[in-house]
Amino acid sequence: MELVVKSVSPETLKTATLVVTINESRVLIGAAQLVDIKSGGAISAVLERGDLAGKSGQTLLLTNLQNIKAERVLLVGIGKDGELSDRQLKKIAGSVLSSLKGLGGSDAVIALDDLSVKNRDTYGKARLFVEALADGEYVFDRFKTQKAEVRPLKKITLLTDKVSVADVERAANHAQAIATGMALTRDLGNLPPNICHPTYLGEEAKALGKAHKNLKVEIHDEKKLAELGMGSFLAVAQGSAQPPRLIVMNYQGGKKGDKPFVLVGKGITFDTGGISIKPAAGMDEMKFDMCGAASVFGTLRAVLELKLPINVVCILACAENMPSGTATRPGDIVTTMSGQTVEILNTDAEGRLVLCDALTYAERFKPQAVIDIATLTGACVVALGGHTSGLLGNNDALINQLLDAGKLADDRAWQLPLFDEYQEQLDSPFADIANIGGPKGGTITAACFLSRFTKAYEWAHLDIAGTAWLSGGKDKGATGRPVPLLTQYLLDRAGV
């Protein structure tokens, strides 16, 4: 969808639909007031009749108003003036888009200035609104024989004052890039595991590299993984007919020699649990166990769209975890790329086994910071539910930067402790470390495991097990998170 930013009087614009806001006090301001005056009190009349209360999300369509060039005027309730939350703003954007899709017009004009959001400046408000519009546009129907109906809406114009045009344009540019990245993340996550396997992700990475001159792509197969000494990574993949892949995408947007930011994504394209097999109920959703890798893919796509002046390395640790006669057994001991040995007590704690070797591999890039993203633990879902990602790490400044980015992007994370006492739960009588730490503090002990492989750099871990996808029902599917958080973090580092 085309998005345009303008600073003109709303009643003078020729458009299929003009969207104006009404608050609960029903005192007309901004665009609604101008349209009301020009139309001879048409909006005041419907409010006096009680046709619209101004409650958040309510809509009322008016047509053929005199002296108004718009064919339709859509009144949208926004609740109490100045008290909109981020969540309410997104719901209003969804309500507007839903109403517009039900109309026949190919374009619409939205008076953005009249939306006042708590703790948001013009840029922040506009970006969230545009991201919400893009989210409402997303459809995944690749495998449907009857495709979703194509709506006629092709263009949206955002109205603002002259002083704010540059801020709104910047917000729209950032939002559209983030939305593109989220859509790619959702597409990859929603693909079935018989299509989206490690080799497929490697081919997608190659295609992205061919399309961008400043993106170098390397695909390491199982032979190369063995040469690198990635015994832990290979142990996860050895039960599957699908070969593993370590995908490395190196974006050079900054100066040569600038230390890169490294994103490491868990890419288990299907997780049965291996020999420690999962229950059958809900196992289909284990195709989403690669959403960490998918979010890194999507963040890179946003970075490419924005042409950020920084260097970013993306490492995707991709494998399939299957039971078979060649699968890893509980009790097996493997040697990681770092040289540390791991006793595998549970083959369903496989994400950390591929990540530990990928995190060791990241050292060679001499990074400014490393962030790994993984659907790692069910314990994180129990602790934080489906609204907030878990965040742990070894550097307070990095943690705070990510927390701040999450707040600005409305893609929040919450810090959990990484105290030394938890490390003791990973003690093994037979190896340097066990791959599980018992039933208590599972998210923390998983991060403790990873921390053993990140001592050479500043590191943070995002556990997105609760936020990467929605389970069951008509809304089931990948969410695209935490692309907004990660992209905001990189925007902040780039200073744009």
Curated annotation (Swiss-Prot):
Note on cofactor: Binds 2 manganese ions per subunit.
GO biological process, one term: proteolysis
EC numbers, comma separated: 3.4.11.1, 3.4.11.10
Protein name: Probable cytosol aminopeptidase
Residues holding Mn(2+) 2: K266, D271, D289, E350
InterPro entries the UniProt entry points to: Leucine_aapep/pepB, Macro_dom-like, Peptidase_M17_C, Peptidase_M17_leu_NH2_pept, Peptidase_M17_N
Subcellular location: Cytoplasm
GO CC terms of this entry: cytoplasm
Residues annotated as the enzyme's active site: K278, R352
Family: Belongs to the peptidase M17 family.
Gene Ontology molecular function: manganese ion binding; metalloaminopeptidase activity
Keyword Cytoplasm attached: yes
Predominant subcellular localization, coarse grouping: cytoplasm
